């Protein structure tokens, strides 16, 4: 070994020792450098943040009492596609100049990236040796460079806000009075999160029926006894709160903007081509992929059949995982939440690539599973999935809205522009397999690694380690 190699090895050893001693400080510096580089890169790319400008135009339209759905904004003549409640929330943006608005939008989305990382780590158990603040900052520093997050900030989109609202709800403790409000508000802003309300409602209904059957069977064996348990449970309560919050957003919008509300719910909501061309490369869902494969802007019954199949399988898997104990399926609540999210993205008529910010908790879950299982297959799948989300592959093929070149793709181009739906199908397939295997597995005490939540008594090994029936009622509340 040469003197140079010795010095290099010594420096590497000292650097590693410093990182282990000061993980939070190192992660904070890493996150700051990453965000700074991201900000510089976006400014160098001269991102337009065009969707943020559309949001401001929506707020301006509301302030001036004009027709919200006749509005066109920016040189691209982009329409409003969101419920009127979103436009009411956008009115404060009208006081900002374009430069201030872009700075504000970037800063808020970077903060929301940290929030999504934090909530993802509340949903998914990490080994105890990983400090939570360091993990949050490191995840945010890396996640900001994946294509869905980059494109969200490039356009000034609200996907991170919607994801944070839903994750914030799902990670609240069981019985929290506000659990469900965030999902209801998110649905009032952007309708797709409404599938989480359906998911929680189905989980609560099945759990309640299971309890009633168990109680009646116990009474029959005992020859009487106390009355059966009530159907009500935390899942149903969250679904009811979310539904109430959503209805309130609709009612508030109807009072403030009666004409626009009536037009949205009777006309605009059914115009699935209003956000853009279905076959566009950025439309990363079943409908977009089928439109490109079939060379038609309307895949018709092919899409309806595929969406029905994926929707049913995805919802059934999510509900089953939600009602499965962690001893049978580690991180069961995370599998349930992400299965529901991927299902919503897959069956929605329009799911632009930036809607896939759920890639951050998805890749985190796969990484945790790869570390827990220690198999080459899981490691390879995690690495490949992460690289695909960071590859910007969906934009490699020719894409141009005026000429609609996506209707004339060759097989290689179809594959490139179907990368997110293919990841979604693979994820749902694995989730369904793991969940089916878990529900057939007998219960046994949970013995994974000790997570950071275990030390606080609120993780898989803490006060919420229960039997399958009781564990199913705590939804995602672990943090």
Predicted features along the sequence, with ranges:
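Primarily membrane-embedded glycan-assembly and transfer machineries that use lipid-linked glycans
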Residues: 2-178, 204-353, 409-412, 417, ...
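Hydrophobic/aromatic-rich transmembrane helices and adjacent perimembrane loops
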Residues: 353-367, 423-424
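Central hydrophobic cores of alpha-helical transmembrane segments
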Residues: 183-186, 242-246, 338-342, 378-389
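Membrane-interface alpha helices of multi-pass inner-membrane proteins
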Residues: 177-201, 340-347
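Alpha-helical transmembrane segments and their membrane-interface exit regions
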Residues: 166-170, 191-192, 271-273, 363-369
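Aromatic-enriched
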Residues: 367-479
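Membrane-helix interface "capping/anchor" motifs
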Residues: 172-180, 371-378
């Amino acid at each position: 070994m040469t003197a140079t190699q010795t010095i290099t090895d010594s420096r590497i050893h000292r650097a590693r020792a410093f990182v282990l001693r000061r993980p939070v400080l190192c992660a904070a510096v890493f996150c700051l450098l990453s965000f700074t580089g991201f900000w510089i890169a976006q400014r160098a790319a001269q991102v337009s943040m065009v969707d943020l400008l559309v949001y401001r135009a929506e707020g301006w339209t509301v302030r001036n009492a004009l027709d919200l759905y006749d509005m066109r904004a920016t040189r691209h003549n982009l329409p409003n596609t969101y419920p009127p409640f979103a436009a009411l929330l956008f009115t404060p943006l009208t006081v900002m100049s374009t430069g201030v608005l872009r700075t504000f939008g970037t800063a808020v989305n970077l903060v929301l990236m940290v929030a999504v990382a934090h909530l993802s780590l509340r949903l998914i158990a990490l080994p105890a040796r990983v400090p939570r603040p360091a993990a949050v900052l490191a995840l945010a520093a890396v996640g900001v460079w994946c294509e869905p997050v980059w494109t969200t900030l490039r356009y000034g989109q609200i996907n991170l806000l919607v994801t944070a609202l839903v994750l914030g709800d799902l990670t609240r403790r069981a019985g929290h009075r506000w659990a469900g409000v965030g999902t209801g508000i998110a649905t009032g802003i952007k309708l797709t999160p409404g599938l989480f309300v359906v998911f929680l409602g189905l989980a609560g209904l099945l759990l309640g029926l299971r309890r009633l059957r168990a109680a009646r069977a116990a009474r029959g064996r005992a020859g009487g006894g106390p009355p059966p348990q009530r159907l009500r449970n935390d899942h149903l309560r969250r679904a009811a709160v979310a539904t109430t919050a959503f209805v309130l957003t609709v009612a508030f919008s109807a009072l403030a903007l009666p004409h626009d509300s009536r037009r949205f719910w009777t006309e605009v909501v059914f115009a699935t081509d209003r956000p853009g061309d279905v076959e566009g490369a950025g439309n990363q869902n079943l409908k977009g992929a089928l439109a490109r494969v079939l060379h038609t802007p309307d895949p018709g019954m092919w899409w309806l059949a595929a969406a029905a199949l994926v929707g049913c399988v995805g919802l059934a898997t999510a509900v089953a995982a939600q009602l499965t104990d962690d001893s049978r399926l580690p991180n069961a609540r995370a599998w349930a939440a992400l299965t529901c999210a991927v299902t919503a993205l897959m069956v929605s008529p329009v799911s632009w690539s930036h809607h896939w910010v759920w890639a951050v908790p998805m890749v985190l879950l796969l990484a945790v599973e790869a570390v827990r299982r220690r198999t080459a297959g899981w490691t390879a799948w995690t690495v490949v999935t992460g690289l695909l989300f960071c590859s910007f592959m969906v934009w490699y093929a020719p894409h141009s809205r005026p000429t609609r070149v996506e209707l004339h793709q060759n097989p290689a181009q179809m594959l490139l522009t179907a990368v997110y739906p293919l990841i979604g199908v693979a994820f749902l397939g694995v989730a369904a397999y793991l969940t089916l295997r878990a529900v057939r597995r007998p219960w046994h005490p949970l013995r994974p690694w000790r997570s950071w939540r275990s030390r606080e008594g609120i993780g898989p090994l803490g006060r919420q380690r229960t039997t399958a029936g009781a564990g199913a009622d705590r939804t995602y509340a672990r943090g």
